[in-house]
Amino acid sequence: MDIIGGQHLRQMWDDLADVYGHKTALICESSGGVVNRYSYLELNQEINRTANLFYTLGIRKGNKVALHLDNCPEFIFCWFGLAKIGAIMVPINARLLREESEWILQNSQACLLVTSAQFYPMYQQIQQEDATQLRHICLTDVALPADDGVSSFTQLKNQQPATLCYAPPLSTDDTAEILFTSGTTSRPKGVVITHYNLRFAGYYSAWQCALRDDDVYMTVMPAFHIDCQCTAAMAAFSAGATFVLVEKYSARAFWGQAQKYRATITECIPMMIRTLMVQPPSANDRQHRLREVMFYLNLSEQEKDAFCERFGVRLLTSYGMTETIVGIIGDRPSDKRRWPSIGRAGFCYEAEIRDDHNRPLPAGEIGEICIKGVPGKTIFKEYFLNPKATAKVLEADGWLHTGDTGYRDEEGFFYFVDRRCNMIKRGGENVSCVELENIIATHPKIQDIVVVGIKDSIRDEAIKAFVVLNEGETLSEEEFFRFCEQNMAKFKVPSYLEIRKDLPRNCSGKIIRKNLK
C-alpha cells in the first residue's frame, strides 16, 4: 500500500503553507523561557531561506550536513531546508563529547556543521586537525568568533529570499537523513532514512494517536532523536496541528507548559514519569487538556496506575526503534488496551516471534520480536556504508530482527520481555533485567534502578543492582535483599548492590549499561 505517492518533503511544506497559511505550526520554548512562534507560512519561508543559505555555501543534492543543536527553531529550519534541496541531515546527539562527535563526522562524511557557541570549541579543534571532511561551521548564536571557515547562521539566513532558489529533482526514495543510533552497547550505526520514511512516519503517527489539525502536540524529547522527529514533529505537521518543542525537560515546569500551550498530546519515557511522580502534589495536577500520552518502555503496573490516577491521563503504548522509524507495535486509536502489552502490529506491518533458528513461534512462547516492512519506506533503508551490519538485522524480504525478546497472545497482542543483550544467564536460568527492575522500582525508597550481569566463575553471571534513592532516604543492604527475596524467585535475587547519585543515560533516557559493567 502506497500512501505517499510522489510527495517528498519539499512538496509537503509547499502544500502545508498553502493549506494552513497563518495557522500556528511551531512553538519553541528555550530553557530561558524565550518563546518563538511560526505559522505554517512563516515556517515554510524560514525553511526556504535556510535552504538558500546552504546552497550559497556550496551544499548540493546528496551532500551531508551535521547538526549539533539542542531543541531550537534552527533545528527545524535546517532539517527541512536541507531536504528541500536534496541534501542530507546528520543530527548529532547534543550530549556527545568530542571523540564521539568526531567519529560521527568522519563516518557520515559531513562537510558542513550547524552548531551553537557552547559546542564550538571542540569543533574548532576538529576542524583545525583536518581529520574529517568538515570544511565550514555555521553558528546559530549572535556572538561569532573571528575564525576562518565560520559563519553566522542567522545573519546568512536573513539575507536570503523567502522563496526557494534551487530546486533539484527529488524522489521519495532519496535519502533525507542519516541518524546514528544511540550506541548503548556498541559504536553507533548510521540509519539511512528516506523522504518516504519521513512522510510515512507523519501519516502513521498521526493515525496512531488520532491527531487532528486542532491538536497541540508538545514534546520535550530531543530533536536529534527519532521519537521527536517521527512520532511528534512529522505527525503534527502532517495533520496540520501545532507542534510545541521545549528545549529541555523539567519535571517542575512540565505541567505548567502543558497547560500554557493547551497541549492535547505529549510523549513520555519512564524517567519522566518517575520524576514527575516525585514532585509535590498540586491542585493543578489535572488542570490540562492532554488526551493521550505516548509512552515508551518500560514501567511497572504499579507505577503506571499511580501516574494515570494522579494526573488523570492515559498512556498510549508505542514500541519501536530508530530502524523501524515509528512505533510499529502499539495501542491503536479507539481500540482496547491490554497492559502490560505493547499493543498490536500497526497498519503496513507484520510482526512475529521467532526462535534462535529464525522459525515463527506460537502464542505464549518467548523469542525475538521480528517486524516485516518495506526498506526505505516503512522501515529504514540500510546502515550507511555498512552492508554487513545491515544484512545481520534485515532480511531480503523485509523482515527486521529487533534484538528484543517478547511473546504474543492469541489475539495478537505483543509483550516485551527485554533486549537480548540484557538477558542475564545465571546458573542455566535466563533472567530479564527489565523484570527485576520493575519489581525493585516498587520499593518506596528507590527512585531509579538498573540491574546488570557481571562475570561469575560459578554461575556464568551474577546480578548487580544499581539504585538511586529518593531524596533524604537511606537503604541498608539487609533491607534491600530482604525486599528482593520477598518479591522474586531466589535465582533472580541480586548478589550485589551499589547505591549511586545517578545513573548514566543517553538522550532518550535509556540506561547506558556498558558504563556500569
UniProtKB/Swiss-Prot annotation:
For this chain's UniProt record, which GO biological process terms are given? Answer: carnitine metabolic process; fatty acid metabolic process
**EC id:** 6.2.1.48
> Matching CDD domains, A to Z?
FACL_DitJ_like (cd05934)
One Pfam family in the UniProt entry: AMP-binding
Catalysis: reaction(s): 4-(trimethylamino)butanoate + ATP + CoA = 4-(trimethylamino)butanoyl-CoA + AMP + diphosphate; crotonobetaine + ATP + CoA = crotonobetainyl-CoA + AMP + diphosphate; (R)-carnitine + ATP + CoA = (R)-carnitinyl-CoA + AMP + diphosphate
The answer to keyword Ligase applying to this record is: yes
Q: Which family does it belong to?
A: Belongs to the ATP-dependent AMP-binding enzyme family.
Protein name (Swiss-Prot/TrEMBL): Crotonobetaine/carnitine--CoA ligase
Native organism: Shigella flexneri
Organism taxonomic ancestry: Bacteria, Pseudomonadati, Pseudomonadota, Gammaproteobacteria, Enterobacterales
Gene name linked to the record: caiC
